[in-house]
Swiss-Prot record:
Chain residues that bind Fe(2+): H172, E255
HAMAP family reported in the protein's UniProt record: Ferrochelatase
Pfam families, per the entry: Ferrochelatase
Keyword Cytoplasm attached: yes
Taxonomy of the source species: Bacteria, Bacillati, Actinomycetota, Actinomycetes, Mycobacteriales
GO molecular function: ferrochelatase activity; metal ion binding
Binding site for Fe-coproporphyrin III: S52, Y116
Role this protein plays: Involved in coproporphyrin-dependent heme b biosynthesis. Catalyzes the insertion of ferrous iron into coproporphyrin III to form Fe-coproporphyrin III.
Main location, first listed in the record: cytoplasm
PANTHER family listed in its UniProt record: FERROCHELATASE, FERROCHELATASE, MITOCHONDRIAL
CDD domains: Ferrochelatase_C, Ferrochelatase_N
Name by which UniProt lists this protein: Coproporphyrin III ferrochelatase
C-alpha cells in the first residue's frame, strides 16, 4: 500500500484565553455538561495562560515526522484549529490521493480509536469528490518503541526519588459501561497490558494501575481506583515516594500538566510523600520513528512489531476512509 502523505490527527487545544471556552464547548457538545463544570475546567487552562501544550507539542512532532520519513505531513484536530475537515480539503486541493493517518492515541476503544475513525469519515464527507483515501494506522500500545520510551522515562524519574519508590501508572478514566461495550473492556485491558510490558522493561516486579481525570455525574460509574484516592491510600500505608507514569497519554495534555503536575503533586507534598512524574513521548524522535514504522508495516506488508508478554491483548488494525477497524474490536461501541 503506497502513501503520498501523512496526516497527524489529534485532539486539539486552545492557544489563548479567548479560545478556552469555545474549545471546551466543542469538546463537550451534546453531552449535557453543566456550564459550571466548563468554568471549572477552564481555570485549568487559564492557569497556563489559556494555552494547551498539545498543539505546540504536535507541531514539534511534525518536524520529527518530516525527519523520520520522506512524505509530506499535514496536521488536523478534532476540537480546534486546524480542524481536520479543513486540513483534508487542503490535502484534496494539493492532489493527495492516499494518506496514512497517525493519531495521538495508542489505544482501542471509542474515544481512543472509533471517534478518530468518525473524524476521518466526517472530514472526507466535508471534502467531497476528490477527497484523499485516509488510512488510520493501528493502535500502538504494544509497539517496542512505545514500551521503550515509557521504560526510559520511568528510569529518569526514578533517579529523582529514593530507591524503592512505588511505581504507579495512570490513564484517562472512562465510564465503566463504555469500556464494557468494547471488547469487552478492551481499553482498560490494553492499558493494563501495556503497563505490565513497560514495568517489566523498566525492571519493576510490582506496580499499580489507576485512573484519572474522570468527569460527568457522580452516579455514573467510571474506571477506578482514582489516582488521588490511591495516593491517599499509599500515604496512609507509609509509602515514602511514588513514581507516576501517565502511560495513557502520549503527550503532556492538560490532564498531565494540571491534574498530575499541579493537583496530585500538591496532594503528595501535603502527605509528606516525594513524587516524580515520568515524561510522556511528546515530540521525541523515537515517537516519530514509531509512526514511520507503522506506515512501513502497511507500505511494505511487514508483520506488525509488537512486544509480547503473558496474556496479550488484541488491538485493531487499519481503518480505511472511516470504515470500522480490522478486526472490528471497536465496532460494538460504534454501533451502540
Amino acid at each position: 500500500m503506497d502513501f503520498d502523505a501523512v496526516l497527524l490527527l489529534s485532539f486539539g487545544g486552545p492557544e489563548g484565553p479567548e479560545q478556552v471556552r469555545p474549545f471546551l464547548e466543542n469538546v463537550t457538545r451534546g453531552r449535557g455538561v453543566p456550564p459550571e463544570r466548563l468554568d471549572h475546567v477552564a481555570e485549568h487552562y487559564l492557569h497556563f495562560g489559556g494555552v494547551s501544550p498539545i498543539n505546540g507539542i504536535n507541531r514539534a512532532l511534525i518536524e520529527q515526522l518530516r525527519a523520520a520519513q520522506a512524505l509530506p505531513v499535514y496536521f488536523g484536530n478534532r476540537n480546534w484549529e486546524p480542524y481536520v475537515e479543513d486540513t483534508v480539503k487542503v490535502m484534496r486541493d494539493n492532489g493527495i490521493r492516499r494518506a496514512a493517518v497517525f493519531t495521538t492515541s495508542a489505544w482501542s476503544g471509542y474515544s481512543s480509536c472509533t471517534q478518530y475513525v468518525e473524524d476521518i469519515a466526517r472530514a472526507r464527507a466535508a471534502a467531497g469528490p476528490g477527497a484523499p483515501e485516509l488510512v488510520k494506522l493501528r493502535p500502538y500500545f504494544d509497539h517496542p518503541l512505545f514500551v521503550e520510551m515509557f521504560a526510559g522515562a520511568i528510569a529518569d524519574a526514578a533517579a529523582k526519588v529514593p530507591a524503592g519508590a512505588r511505581l504507579v501508572f495512570t490513564a484517562h478514566s472512562v465510564p465503566v459501561a463504555a469500556d464494557e461495550r468494547v471488547g469487552p473492556r478492551l481499553y482498560s485491558r490494553q492499558v493494563a497490558y501495556a503497563a505490565r510490558l513497560v514495568a517489566a522493561a523498566a525492571g519493576y516486579a510490582e506496580h499499580d494501575l489507576v485512573w484519572q481525570s474522570r468527569s460527568g455525574p457522580p452516579q455514573v460509574r467510571w474506571l477506578e481506583p482514582d489516582v488521588a484516592d490511591h495516593l491517599r491510600a499509599l500515604a496512609e500505608s507509609g509509602t515514602p515516594a511514588v513514581i507516576v507514569c501517565p502511560i495513557g497519554f502520549v503527550a503532556d495534555h492538560i490532564e498531565v500538566v494540571w491534574d498530575l503536575d499541579e493537583e496530585l503533586r500538591a496532594q503528595a507534598e501535603s502527605a509528606g510523600m516525594l513524587m516524580a512524574r515520568a515524561s510522556t513521548p511528546n515530540a521525541q524522535p523515537r515517537f516519530a520513528r514509531l509512526a514511520a514504522d507503522l506506515i512501513d508495516e502497511l507500505r511494505c506488508g511487514r508483520t506488525p512489531a509488537r512486544v509480547t508478554g503473558p496474556d496479550p491483548v488484541p488491538g485493531c488494525l487499519a481503518s480505511v476512509n472511516g470504515a470500522p477497524c480490522r478486526p472490528p474490536h471497536c465496532a460494538a461501541q460504534a454501533t451502540g
